[in-house]
Curated annotation (Swiss-Prot):
Enzyme class, broadest EC rank: transferase
Annotated catalysed reactions: N(6)-carboxybiotinyl-L-lysyl-[protein] + acetyl-CoA = N(6)-biotinyl-L-lysyl-[protein] + malonyl-CoA
Organism: Laribacter hongkongensis (strain HLHK9)
Name of the featured protein: Acetyl-coenzyme A carboxylase carboxyl transferase subunit alpha
Assigned protein family: Belongs to the AccA family.
Signal peptide range: none
Single GO cellular component term: acetyl-CoA carboxylase complex
């Protein structure tokens, strides 16, 4: 698949186009231009490293939304075996925006759950662009309770712009479904590892991201609102989105500094979409490390540690002491 380049990647795109042109020339010519191709490839790699070493939060948000990034089902198929997808919330309907089911991770039975956006237009519409309705969150909770019943660790993959704000979703109790998940996940008697793989949008992301360890991919984002949404509210124009992204602190490195996540998982140079295979290897190692220390903990200790980490979210300054 040909790589889709973002606006700030245009210098890289120009080099890659030159490389492709030279490859076509080499195929139709007796001239050996392999050295020139290798030189341009090295230049492209170095330029990619340089650009990605100083991304702004707004640029990171663009990478997090890249249409070629691996999605939940890609990770499940790559790092798990024997995946058996389960459907429906047993109350209203099945929501394709959230996928989940039983699988094996390194031979251990687990429950995997995550948002799924879709690749082409047809699938994007089917999966509502990764924006779950209440039945999606209730399906996720049903699978978590099933995991608790059978003593299975839960692995969640977060990648959503946010919960769907449609009238029907609100009528069916969107806020209640999200709130219920927050409550139940905080008390789930099995290990829960959550990983933000793309967009972590507001309560729609948080509804499957309460756990014992929260990871983020290097170029993923996690925020109470999108930069465009924040800019529209504060400055009445989406053009201020880069400023909003900076102020919101949406990047993995910033959230790690604030103590809101536990680990940043490195991505391949140029983002996860540039090398799916390498990203899958990194994900598998990270999940293995996350689970290793949790599966042996007694339930009481697991719940106490989870409660303690939740209670330590957020910091404030006492104005009276200033």
């Amino acid at each position: 698949m040909k790589t889709t380049f973002l606006d700030f990647e245009q210098p890289i795109a120009e080099l890659e186009n030159k490389i492709e042109e030279l490859r076509y020339v080499q195929d139709d010519s007796v001239l050996d231009i392999s050295e020139e191709i290798a030189r341009l490839q090295k230049k492209s790699q170095d330029l990619t490293k340089t650009i990605y070493s100083k991304l702004t939060p707004w640029q990171v948000s663009q990478v997090a939304r890249h249409p070629q990034r691996p999605y939940t089902l890609d990770y499940i198929q790559a790092v798990c075996t024997d995946f058996d997808e389960l459907h429906g919330d047993r109350a209203y309907a099945d929501d394709p925006a959230i996928v989940g089911g039983m699988a094996r991770f390194n031979g251990q039975a687990v429950m995997v759950i995550g948002h799924q956006k879709g690749r082409d237009t047809k699938e994007k519409i089917l999966r509502n662009f990764g924006m779950p309705r209440p039945e999606g969150y209730r399906k996720a909770l049903r699978l978590m309770k099933l995991a608790e019943k059978f003593g299975l660790p839960v692995l969640t993959f977060v990648d959503t712009p946010g919960a769907y704000p449609g009238i029907g979703a609100e009528e069916r109790g969107q806020s209640e479904a999200i709130g219920r998940n927050l409550y139940e996940m905080s008390r789930l008697k099995v290990p829960v590892v959550c990983t933000v793989i793309g967009e972590g949008g507001s309560g729609g992301a948080l509804a499957i991201a309460i756990g014992d360890q929260v990871n983020m991919l290097q170029y993923s984002t996690y925020s109470v609102i999108s930069p465009e949404g924040c800019a529209s509210i504060l400055w009445k124009t989406a053009e201020k989105a880069p400023d909003a992204a900076e102020a919101l602190g949406i990047t993995a490195s910033r959230l790690k500094t604030l103590g809101l996540i536990d680990k940043v998982i490195n991505e391949p140079v140029g983002g996860a979409h540039r090398d799916h295979a390498q990203m899958m290897q990194g994900m598998k190692r990270a999940l293995h490390d996350s689970l290793k220390g949790l599966t042996t903990q007694p339930v009481d200790q697991l719940l106490a540690s989870r409660f303690d980490r939740l209670m330590h979210y957020g910091k404030f300054k006492d104005a009276s002491a200033a």
